[in-house]
Amino acid sequence: MGVTGILQLPRDRFKRTSFFLWVIILFQRTFSIPLGVIHNSTLQVSDVDKLVCRDKLSSTNQLRSVGLNLEGNGVATDVPSATKRWGFRSGVPPKVVNYEAGEWAENCYNLEIKKPDGSECLPAAPDGIRGFPRCRYVHKVSGTGPCAGDFAFHKEGAFFLYDRLASTVIYRGTTFAEGVVAFLILPQAKKDFFSSHPLREPVNATEDPSSGYYSTTIRYQATGFGTNETEYLFEVDNLTYVQLESRFTPQFLLQLNETIYTSGKRSNTTGKLIWKVNPEIDTTIGEWAFWETKKTSLEKFAVKSCLSQLYQTEPKTSVVRVRRELLPTQGPTQQLKTTKSWLQKIPLQWFKCTVKEGKLQCRI
């Protein structure tokens, strides 16, 4: 015959402690929504079907997939830094997985790279894969490189996010953002978890000012793409370029572009003119509102769910990037209307021009 006992606790001493224990237990059982992140491109469709766990996941209908951009973690987004995270490799088949919702990206990329013999480095996008739909700046890189491999993969195992599809490889001329795919596990299946439906919009929607969405394409030329000796030029027009540096923000490049146009510093011959920016010029101009919405926590999050085989078990400390504090006399960065203020911030000074390898190079 079994014996049942009840643990008695001193009433006064443990009353408050036991109350909080009950609250924690009830809260955990009622509101637990674990978040599993696929961090290394190893997802198989069958894996998701197998993720039926006791007390957490009774149906795959409780899973909601979300695309999370890497730039929210504070990775460097300038073209020279971003492209170093990608590399060509053969013998690995591409994988594609869909996601239901994503976030707006500040920086996206679009590559058109050819081999020295003129053949294409990157494959065309398969049917159904469209460019990432929400990019403030699209960095479009054209040029040449050895491209020693069949596909361009992410060296850190992240995905390339397209329009509701994430791929392990880069497709030619198709805009993408870097990111990972995360699964939200809901307490119960909800059809309307994401209230807004995917947008069905015309290709030229960004030209409509009423859409409330503004995207700018910034063009670059690359030589030796994918090597340690890659050189990048920011394209002002088809004859005028600026030697690109990692410290240049998209906003600075747009200011520089407008300054060169309005001050008549474009190439006035049939030759190629390459500018170099004075190292003393401050290039840290940016849109602080973007980082206000991307702040992450230094706190270590303990992830507990049945997706444990798909993400790292060791909790990682998120990188925090805080916006540059504004002085009392400063205001938030505004959209450019005129070029007067930018001419003051980027003084044009003429230095001696030299001809190198048949190209005229000057310093600003």
From Swiss-Prot:
Effect of R324S: Loss of cleavage
Keyword Ribonucleoprotein included in the entry's annotation: no
An annotated Gene Ontology molecular function: channel activity
GO BP term, example: monoatomic ion transmembrane transport
Domain of life per record: Viruses
Residues carrying the site annotation Cleavage: R324, E325
Chain segments annotated as transmembrane: none
Keywords, sorted A to Z: Cleavage on pair of basic residues, Disulfide bond, Glycoprotein, Ion channel, Ion transport, Secreted, Signal, Transport, Viral ion channel
Protein name: Pre-small/secreted glycoprotein
Gene responsible for this protein: GP
